[in-house]
């Protein structure tokens, strides 16, 4: 059986990690093989610390994310899919397009060109976008990292970027209101996923 690749996206504080864990538990309870992973750090764990703590140019930041993603795809995601697992990634390429493209202002054609090589063209079957107003996201974040310290206007651009990506690929994106209760969001994710499960 071929695997299934799912991603969760959204601003920090939107509940992605919580929902990724809930989704993994839901699928495991049905006896489905699941691989839960995340970016950054899914391919090169030491890159995560560097990305979240060092002052970097937007270009260097994106290239480091891309190096991590290339290894993540090669070492984790593709083998998981080949083994027939449901691979759930807490962030993937759309995070870079939203944060480094829309947020930091890097040109989207260049980002996509680098991404094509790093991901080997691999796209998720479904991406759950947990949409949250930036004001609420900043209130929810406990210990801001370097990126979270960029301010409200930055996160408004990132949110608009995510929504633009979702509008461009309505067949892949499921936009969910991240202000809803956790349980309600989990049920909505499960409902959208059921038609894809054998």
Swiss-Prot record:
Top EC class for this record: transferase
Signal sequence coordinates: none
One MF term in the entry's GO annotations: ATP binding
Positions of ATP binding: 10-17
Catalytic reactions of this protein: dTMP + ATP = dTDP + ADP
Cellular component annotations (GO), alphabetically ordered: cytosol
PROSITE patterns reported for this sequence: THYMIDYLATE_KINASE (PS01331)
Pfam families, per the entry: Thymidylate_kin
InterPro entries in the cross-refs: P-loop_NTPase, Thymidylate_kin-like_dom, Thymidylate_kin_CS, Thymidylate_kinase
Task performed by this protein: Phosphorylation of dTMP to form dTDP in both de novo and salvage pathways of dTTP synthesis.
NCBIfam families membership: DTMP_kinase
Family (UniProt): Belongs to the thymidylate kinase family.
PANTHER family recorded: THYMIDYLATE KINASE, UMP-CMP KINASE 2, MITOCHONDRIAL
Identification of the protein by name: Thymidylate kinase
Native species: Thermus thermophilus (strain ATCC 27634 / DSM 579 / HB8)
């Amino acid at each position: 059986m071929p695997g299934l690749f799912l991603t969760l996206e959204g601003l920090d504080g939107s509940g992605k990690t919580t929902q990724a864990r809930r989704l993994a538990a839901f699928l495991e309870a049905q006896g489905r093989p699941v691989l839960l992973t995340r970016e950054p750090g899914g391919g090169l764990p030491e890159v995560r610390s560097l990305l979240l703590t060092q002052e970097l140019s937007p270009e260097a930041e994106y290239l480091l994310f891309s190096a991590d993603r290339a290894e993540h795809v090669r070492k984790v995601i593709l083998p998981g899919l080949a083994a027939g697992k449901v691979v759930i990634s807490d962030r993937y390429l759309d995070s870079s397009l939203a944060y480094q493209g829309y947020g930091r202002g890097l040109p989207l054609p260049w980002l996509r060109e680098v991404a094509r090589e790093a991901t080997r063209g691999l796209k998720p079957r479904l991406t759950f976008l947990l949409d949250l107003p930036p004001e609420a996201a900043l209130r929810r974040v406990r210990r801001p990292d370097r990126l979270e310290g960029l301010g409200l206007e930055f996160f408004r651009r990132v949110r608009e970027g995510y929504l633009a990506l979702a509008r461009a690929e309505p067949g892949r994106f499921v936009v969910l209101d991240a202000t809803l209760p956790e349980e309600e969001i989990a049920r909505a994710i499960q409902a959208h996923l059921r038609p894809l499960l054998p």
